A protein has these predicted regions:
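PRPP-associated nucleotide enzymes
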Residues: 1-259
Length: 259
């Protein structure tokens, strides 16, 4: 929109000064250990973004390709959960040779459901947000590609939606590892007891979401997809290992308003 040319990101603690003499860059803090949010490439960022110097669509497509290598399945169509599952589904389809079909149509006037405050609003949001294309699903073995599973309730409703539209089988593929820990760095994720992967086995999650099979991308494949060769990303939501000391008790008190 502004007809700009991408040069680089503004680094943490850096100040970019644009003046008559040109552009100068200064660091006003001591450089520390970098811990970029890996979930930006999985879910948050638009696919046409360049985040931490890496194209998001390219990262997500590679996640899908590696997901197909790690967890192949015999199927008739690959269907994304739009929008954040689209690039990964394209990669999965390209790697597996299974045709890609846009069989879930998204209403773009509905926001992201996993951060809504109540389950009732999240459930209603799924109905408003997605509509299946029956003739693309009926009688088909479907690989359903999504970016993540948080509570599992949204995934279950989408699996049911695809099955009710006539799908013969629904195989759920997730383009990141299981989310087992909350984020304490500004993302309003649920508490750990609400995260389905923190409290259930893979088979229990599969049964809950009512899929014929379920598989997640591995940690190594995620790192490869976002080209994290120097350990500069945060994976705390998948590992529980935070890059800084986290006072969990104080955060819980602050969120609940207790003293």
């Amino acid at each position: 929109l502004i007809n700009a040319t991408y040069v680089s990101d503004v680094e943490p603690g850096e100040m970019v000064i644009v003046g008559p003499e040109g552009i100068t860059r200064e660091h006003y803090t001591t450089p520390g250990v970098t811990a970029h949010c890996s979930f930006e490439h999985v879910y948050f960022s638009r696919p046409d973004s360049i985040v931490f110097g890496k194209p998001v669509a390219e990262s997500r497509e590679q996640m899908g390709r590696l997901l197909a290598r790690e967890h192949p399945v015999e199927a008739d169509v690959v269907v994304p959960v739009p929008d954040s599952g689209v690039s990964a589904a394209i990669g999965y389809a390209a790697e597996s040779g299974i045709p890609y079909r846009q069989a879930l149509i998204r209403n773009h006037y509905v926001g992201r459901t996993f951060i809504e405050p109540s389950q009732a609003i999240r459930d209603f949001g799924v109905k408003l947000k997605l509509n299946p294309v029956r003739h693309l699903l009926e009688g088909k073995r479907v690989v359903l590609v999504d970016d993540s599973i948080v509570r599992g309730t949204t995934s279950r409703k989408i699996v049911r939606m695809v099955r009710n539209a006539g799908a013969r089988e629904v195989h759920l593929r997730i383009s990141c590892p299981p989310t087992i820990s909350p984020c304490y760095y500004g993302v309003d994720t649920p508490s750990q007891n609400e995260l389905i992967a923190a409290n259930n086995s893979l088979e229990q999650i599969r049964e809950f979401v009512e899929a014929d099979s379920l598989a997640y991308l591995s940690h190594d494949a995620l790192r490869d997809s976002i080209k994290d060769t120097n350990g500069q990303f945060c994976y705390a939501c998948y590992t529980g290992k935070y890059p800084t000391l986290v006072q969990i008790g104080e955060i819980v008190l602050a969120k609940t308003g207790c003293c």
